[in-house]
C-alpha cells in the first residue's frame, strides 16, 4: 500500500503531505486529518528540543507499552513550560482547537528511538477528547490511518520536522493510526528515512472529565 506510489493525491500546492486510497477518503478526512508543514521555525524546534532533552534523557527507552501499541519509546507528561515554549503551545491551541474546547492541562511528550514505531491503534475516548494536535521534532515520519471497518480506505500523512498534525473526530475514532517503522517508511515511492522522533501532543479534554483530572495517557502519535 505505502510503497506502490500508484496514487499520490495532493491537498496542497507543491510537495504533497497527504495521500490516500481515493478521492472519497480524502474528502471525508479533509478537515479531520490535517498537516501543516513548517508550522515551527528552526529556532522554535530548537527551543522545544532543548527544553525536553534533559527530562527525556533521565528516562530509558521502553519496548513494552501498557497496551502494546508502542515499541522503542520513552514518554512523559509535562505541564510546566518556559515562556517561549508556552507561546508555541498557544499557537497550537489556536490552530487546532475550537473556542469551546478545553485542553488537558498536561502535554504528552513521546520520544521514539530510530528503530521505534507505533502500531495501529484507535485512541480511547477515556483519555482524550475529540481532537489531538502534535508537533513533530527531529526526524520525518509517515503516519498511516486505516479505516477500522473498510481496510481498503486509508490515508497517509508525511510529518516533517517542524510540522503540525491535527486529528479530529472520524480520523481518530473510525480509523486506526500508526507511525511506520524505518524499514516500512515510504510515502508513495519516496523513502522517508526514520531517525529519532519527538512528538509534542496537545489533547482536548475527554467528555465528562474536569480540567484538573488526568488518567493513563493514550498511545498518541
UniProtKB/Swiss-Prot annotation:
One of this protein's Pfam families, by short name? 2OG-FeII_Oxy_2
Positions binding 2-oxoglutarate in this chain are: 165, 197-199, 203
- Per the UniProt entry, the Enzyme Commission number(s) are 1.14.11.-
Its required cofactor(s), as named, are:
Fe(2+)
Q: Cross-referenced Gene3D superfamilies, in alphabetical order?
A: Alpha-ketoglutarate-dependent dioxygenase AlkB-like
- InterPro entries reported in the protein's UniProt record: AlkB-like, AlkB-like_sf, ALKBH7-like
| A GO CC annotation given for this chain | mitochondrion
One of the GO BP terms on file: regulation of lipid storage
Instruction: List UniProt keywords, sorted A-Z.
Output: Dioxygenase, Iron, Metal-binding, Mitochondrion, Necrosis, Oxidoreductase, Transit peptide
Example GO molecular function: dioxygenase activity
Q: Where in the cell is it found?
A: Mitochondrion matrix
Chain segment of the transit peptide? 1-20
Q: How is the cofactor bound?
A: Binds 1 Fe(2+) ion per subunit.
Q: Which residues bind Fe cation?
A: 121, 123, 177
Q: Which domain of life is it from?
A: Eukaryota
**What does the tissue specificity note say?**
Widely expressed, with highest expression in pancreas, followed by spleen, prostate, ovary and placenta.
Assembly and partners are described as:
Monomer.
Q: What does this protein do?
A: May function as protein hydroxylase; can catalyze auto-hydroxylation at Leu-110 (in vitro), but this activity may be due to the absence of the true substrate. Required to induce programmed necrosis in response to DNA damage caused by cytotoxic alkylating agents. Acts by triggering the collapse of mitochondrial membrane potential and loss of mitochondrial function that leads to energy depletion and cell death. ALKBH7-mediated necrosis is probably required to prevent the accumulation of cells with DNA damage. Does not display DNA demethylase activity. Involved in fatty acid metabolism.
Family label: Belongs to the alkB family.
Name of the protein described by the UniProt record:
Alpha-ketoglutarate-dependent dioxygenase alkB homolog 7, mitochondrial
